[in-house]
């Protein structure tokens, strides 16, 4: 059986990792082992960040809707309940956009929710 020399594959792998580590400080962009550790950590953090982003935006939308609803005299949970029972299907992202960009329309939505809840 022939001997396998890994020089080409190893060099290719090292080049790939060092390219990903471009712009890192000091040895983290020059030395393979530290660069590899940094790249692995960076990729893991990027993966986790993509998951957290969804949670963070949902929280932001809820905070915005709650603030706008309270200005109109209704809490977030009561507002959402009133909207759901009225049969209005608007997601939180759109509600938060309406609350910021078109307060008049949002006030009308709050009135619909209040009428549905008999408040």
From Swiss-Prot:
Keywords linked to the UniProt accession: Ribonucleoprotein, Ribosomal protein, RNA-binding, rRNA-binding
PANTHER family reported in the protein's UniProt record: 39S RIBOSOMAL PROTEIN L20
Gene Ontology cellular-component annotations: ribonucleoprotein complex; ribosome
Coiled coil: none
Organism annotation: Clostridium kluyveri (strain ATCC 8527 / DSM 555 / NBRC 12016 / NCIMB 10680 / K1)
A Pfam match: Ribosomal_L20
Protein purpose: Binds directly to 23S ribosomal RNA and is necessary for the in vitro assembly process of the 50S ribosomal subunit. It is not involved in the protein synthesizing functions of that subunit.
Superkingdom of this protein's organism: Bacteria
UniProt-recorded name of the protein: Large ribosomal subunit protein bL20
GO function terms (MF aspect): rRNA binding; structural constituent of ribosome
